[in-house]
Amino acid sequence: MYSIIIACLVLLLCLVIYFGHRADHALKYLEGMWHGDPVFLKQSGLQSFYLYIQPGHTCFFSVVNKKGEKLMETKIHCTITNKIYMFFKPIFEFHVVMAHTHSYFPKQFNFLLDSTEGKLILENNHVIYAVLYKDNFATALGKTVEKYIT
């Protein structure tokens, strides 16, 4: 009887460690360059949407409309917390709080990271602000340049 209880506790501990480890990898994957999904950009009337997340969680946003006008090009300090793994979907949810508000984004929103598609959704209260895909080449290039600068 006790061996079954101990086996269940060990299994539960292994599951907690496994999902916590996956959430840490997702947070590391979050860092880098993200660019707007072409279909989403067309539907929202934008020409481009770029997001760069530094390891210290400083976010650089660049948003350009169809006319080529910069709607937003700014550096925003974000606090990214509360890693939640959704068990039935390979999606990680990150709660983001910006240090300063901006006219295009609320102060708090969520990053929803779909690890199977490499897709990042910025949303708040079921309002989608952006659908982004990871640009691995730009991310690797940025890390290489950063390594030589420091």
Swiss-Prot record:
Keyword entries, A-Z: Signal, Virion
Superkingdom of the organism of origin: Viruses
Record bears the keyword Signal: yes
GO terms under cellular component: virion component
Localization: Virion
Signal peptide: 1-23
Family the entry assigns: Belongs to the asfivirus EP152R family.
Protein name: Uncharacterized protein EP152R
Organism in which the protein naturally occurs: African swine fever virus (isolate Pig/Kenya/KEN-50/1950)
